Design a protein with these regions (language model features):
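Phosphate- and divalent-cation-binding pockets in alpha/beta enzyme and binding domains
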Residues: 121, 193-194
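A residue-level signal for conserved active-site and pocket-lining positions in enzyme catalytic cores
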Residues: 29, 70, 154, 194
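TOPRIM metal-binding catalytic domain and adjacent DNA-binding surface shared by DnaG-type primases
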Residues: 1-62, 66-69, 101-105, 179, ...
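Class I S-adenosyl-L-methionine
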Residues: 30, 123, 174-178
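Metal-dependent DNA phosphodiester-chemistry modules and their immediately adjacent helices/loops
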Residues: 199-214
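Phosphate-handling DNA/RNA-contact segment within nucleic-acid enzymes
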Residues: 2, 6, 48-151, 165-168
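RNase H-like polynucleotidyl transferase catalytic core
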Residues: 130-135, 182-192
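Modules that initiate DNA replication and primer synthesis
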Residues: 139-187, 197-198
Length: 214
C-alpha cells in the first residue's frame, strides 16, 4: 500500500508527463490506433523531469496505472526506438491491473487483454477491458474483480511463430481462463495482438470477436 505522499508524487508525475507528451510519442501512438484525444484520456505522456526511479526512461512513453478512485499507483514505460527491451518499469514496483476502473462498469461483458495499449484499443470500441502485463503479473485475487459479469473474454497475444516452440500469449489466456468463472478464450490470428487485429480489420471486426457492442 502506497502512502499518501507516494501516491501524490506519482499522480503529479503522471500529470506532468501527460502535459509534456512529445510529437514523436503522439505519432507512435497514432500509428497504433491511439489518437491524441485518447492518449489524453488515459494520461499517456513522455518522461521529462523524471522522479526517482524513472531516470533511465527519459523520452519514453509513460503509461500510468490508476485505481478505480483515480489514484496513480505505478507506471509502465514504452520506448520509441527499436532498442530492447521495448517496455520497462521502475525497479521494485508491484504489478497492477491496468484500467481496473473497467471492472466497475455496468456491462454484461468485459475483456481481459495482455497489455495496456490493447486494453485502451478495446475500451475505445465501447467494450470494457483491462490489461494484464503477462501471465506472471496475474494475481490470485484478480478473479473476484470479475464477479457479476455474464461473460469475460480473455484475449492473449498469439505469439505463434515458426522459430518459437512456446506461445506465451496462449499460456496467459489458458491460465487466466482457468481461474475466472464465465470466461471464454478468444484466439487471434497467428502473430497478432489486439492492436494488430484492429489496425488490419477495423473496429467492427474486433468487436465481433466478443459478440459485438451491446
Amino acid at each position: 500500500m502506497l502512502s499518501t505522499t507516494q501516491s501524490t508524487l506519482l499522480s503529479e508525475a503522471a500529470h506532468r508527463y501527460a502535459q509534456a507528451i512529445s510529437e514523436e510519442a503522439l505519432a507512435y501512438l497514432d500509428a497504433r490506433g491511439i489518437s491524441e484525444v485518447t492518449a489524453a484520456r488515459y494520461s499517456l505522456g513522455t518522461i521529462v523531469d523524471p522522479i526517482e526511479g524513472h531516470q533511465g526512461y527519459t523520452g519514453w512513453i509513460s503509461i500510468p496505472y490508476f485505481t478505480a478512485l483515480d489514484i496513480c499507483v505505478g507506471f509502465k514505460f514504452r520506448r520509441l526506438d527499436d532498442g530492447k527491451p521495448k517496455y520497462g518499469a521502475p525497479v521494485g514496483q508491484k504489478s497492477h491491473l491496468y484500467n481496473v476502473t473497467a471492472t466497475t462498469y455496468d456491462s454484461p461483458k468485459i475483456v481481459i487483454c495482455e497489455g495496456e495499449f490493447d486494453a485502451i484499443i478495446m475500451n475505445e470500441t465501447g467494450i470494457p477491458a483491462v490489461g494484464v502485463p503477462g501471465v506472471a503479473a496475474w494475481k490470485p485475487f484478480y478473479p473476484k474483480l470479475f464477479t457479476g459479469f455474464d461473460v469475460i473474454y480473455v484475449i492473449g497475444d498469439n505469439d505463434t511463430r515458426e522459430d518459437k516452440e512456446t506461445n506465451p500469449g496462449a499460456e496467459f489466456a489458458r491460465r487466466v481462463a482457468s481461474e475466472v468463472v464465465n470466461s471464454q478464450i478468444v484466439q487471434l490470428p497467428p502473430g497478432m495482438d489486439i492492436t494488430d487485429f484492429y489496425l488490419a480489420n477495423g473496429k467492427d471486426e474486433l468487436t465481433n470477436l466478443v459478440g459485438g457492442v451491446r
